Every structure is written in structure tokens, then in C-alpha cells.
Design a protein with these regions (language model features):
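Extracytoplasmic "Venus flytrap"
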Residues: 1-14, 30-39, 188
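Extracytoplasmic/secreted envelope proteins and their assembly/folding machinery
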Residues: 9, 13, 41-45, 53, ...
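An alpha-beta-alpha
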Residues: 12, 102-150, 247, 251-267
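Structural motif
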Residues: 26-50, 160-175
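Beta-alpha junction/loop-to-helix N-cap segments that form part of ligand/metal-binding clefts
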Residues: 34-91, 186-210
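Hydrophobic alpha-helical segments within soluble ligand-binding/sensing domains
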Residues: 84-126, 225-246
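Pocket-lining segment of extracytoplasmic ligand-binding domains
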Residues: 136-211
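Hinge/cleft segment of the Venus flytrap/periplasmic-binding protein
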Residues: 240-287
């Protein structure tokens, strides 16, 4: 399960369904979940291509990469993709992918996220940056945060883990080094927040997270976009293409502008951290 990605999918289906209904048309969705497996992404994309669908929505970086590599004649909209230039290997990315690809980005304001570390853990002299090395978007976010911290005179060190096998050991290293820990928007982290929490909470090390789903599992606070709204935005782009003949090659990547400061009440209490009044409590989702 990956709550953020599921929210984006639901937003997409709701928005496109509504736009189609308004136009007196119906839309059929073929929902396939690759569970973050690259080989499954490739297989699913192959099936979509063979069925000659009108549009492919690719949720998350691995899905977008698989679709963009295999399909050139069907419009592809990405969502929950952090940095399209990094994901698709485009040098000097200017905001528009071109060809048959566009979509929405879940990139948060990284400077503001970095500043949160300094605001909430003012005594922090060293910050550990924990992320999955298999995700290029995570590396991008971590470098930006490190740059900001360095300019503020705060030391940081990267703690990349390869997969779930070494996550616990690497998280332990991060918790031993850092006065605080930053984890970016990262699919592997999102699926393994319990492991990270089990290591870091007993050591009383606060984690600032790139998005709400991760923060709800192991963080103290986040500046998070709404993945549902990101999906809605993607669905509206799909409607422009399918109903109004918009040219996807000219559509710039869109960003969500509804980011909110949120906090995990349980972990903040456990670590004795008080957040400013403008922070909104993360509601635990019913299992």
C-alpha cells in the first residue's frame, strides 16, 4: 500500500470521470498496479500499448519511465513524479517534456522543507539525509536540501540505502550521526516507514519528511502537497487532451500549489517537540 499514490490515482479518476460526464461521454479505466516493481511496469505498459488505449496515466517515476521508454504514439501523463528532467534524463529541462509526455510533479518546496529542520530542531548541528539510492528523484531532493543547510552553516551527510535489506542498518547509521534526519519524497521509504520509525524513535531522533504519507509513518512534520489534488490536476489535463484535442507536446508539467505544514502528533509528543500553530495535525487513516 502507498497512500500518496493511491490518492493521486483516485483524484485522477474522479476528475476525468467528472469532465467526461459533463461532456456527455463515458470513460473506461484499466487500473493496473505494478507495486513498485520495474519489470511489472514494463509488462503492464506493453499490454496498454497492445490495446491501443487513448491515454496512459503513469503514477510514480518507475511507471513513467517504463511508459516513456516503450510508447511513442499514445499520450502519457505522469503523476507523483518529482523531477521530470531527472526521471527522463533530459538535460537542461525547461518545464515541458515534449513528444507524447507531460503530467504533474509532486516536488515540494525543498528550501522550506530544509528550513523546517532548523525551525523545529534549532539545536541541530548535523542532519542525516536518508533515502533510497535506486530513486534518482530522491538524490535530487537530498542534494537541494544539503545545499540549503550548508548555506545556513549546518553539516549534513547522505545515508543512501539500496533496498529494504539494508534499510535498518543504514537508518541506524543515520540516527547515530544526525541530530535530526531528513527523508525526501521516496517510494521505497514510503513503503517502509515502520522500519525507520522502529530505529529512530527510540533514539529520540526527529525526522522531517518530504510528504504526508511518510510523515504519518515516521516523521514529526512535513510541508506536503495533496496527492489527491495532484491527481485531480492530472485528470483535468487528460480531459484537455481527450475532449479538447490539446497537444500534449506543448503542455508544461504542472505543480500542486496547495502545500500545507503538517505534523505527526504522536511522534512529536514522544520526542517532546512543539510545532507552530499554523501546522495541521495529520489524521490517521482508518485501516
Amino acid at each position: 500500500p502507498h497512500p500518496a499514490l493511491d490518492d493521486a490515482t483516485n483524484g485522477f479518476r474522479d476528475a476525468l470521470g467528472e469532465e467526461m460526464e459533463k461532456a456527455g461521454k463515458t470513460v473506461k479505466f484499466d487500473y493496473q498496479n505494478a507495486s513498485n516493481e520495474t519489470s511489472a511496469c514494463t509488462t503492464i505498459v506493453g499490454n496498454f500499448k497492445a490495446k491501443k488505449y487513448d491515454l496512459i496515466m503513469a503514477n510514480a517515476t518507475a511507471a513513467l519511465q517504463a511508459a516513456a521508454n516503450a510508447v511513442t504514439d499514445i499520450p502519457i501523463l505522469g503523476t507523483s513524479v518529482t523531477e521530470y528532467g531527472v526521471a527522463l534524463g533530459i538535460d537542461n529541462f525547461n518545464g515541458t517534456v515534449g513528444g507524447n509526455v507531460s503530467g504533474t510533479s509532486d516536488l515540494g518546496d525543498l528550501d522550506k522543507q530544509a528550513q523546517m529542520i532548523l525551525d523545529l530542531v534549532p539545536s541541530a548541528k548535523k542532519v542525516a539525509l536518508l533515502y533510497c539510492s535506486a530513486e534518482p528523484n530522491s538524490k535530487y531532493q537530498v542534494l537541494k536540501v544539503a545545499e540549503y543547510l550548508s548555506a545556513k552553516g549546518v553539516e549534513s551527510k547522505e545515508y543512501p540505502f539500496a533496498d529494504t535489506n539494508d534499510l535498518s542498518a543504514v537508518a541506524t547509521g543515520a540516527a547515530d550521526y544526525g541530530d535530526a534526519i531528513y527523508v525526501p519524497t521516496d517510494n521505497t521509504v514510503a513503503a517502509n516507514t515502520e522500519t525507520i520509525d522502529a530505529v529512530c524513535r527510540p533514539k529520540k531522533k526527529p525526522i522531517i519528511a518530504g510528504e504526508e504519507g511518510i510523515c504519518g509513518g515516521c516523521g514529526i512534520a512535513t510541508l506536503s502537497i495533496s496527492y489527491y489534488q495532484l491527481g485531480v490536476k492530472t485528470g483535468k489535463m487528460a480531459a484537455e487532451i481527450l475532449l479538447r484535442g490539446a497537444d500534449i507536446s506543448k503542455m508544461p508539467v504542472q505543480y500542486d500549489d496547495s502545500a500545507m505544514y503538517k505534523y505527526n502528533a504522536e511522534i512529536c509528543e514522544a520526542l517532546g517537540i512543539t510545532v507552530p500553530e499554523n501546522y495541521v495535525k495529520i489524521e490517521k487513516k482508518a485501516e
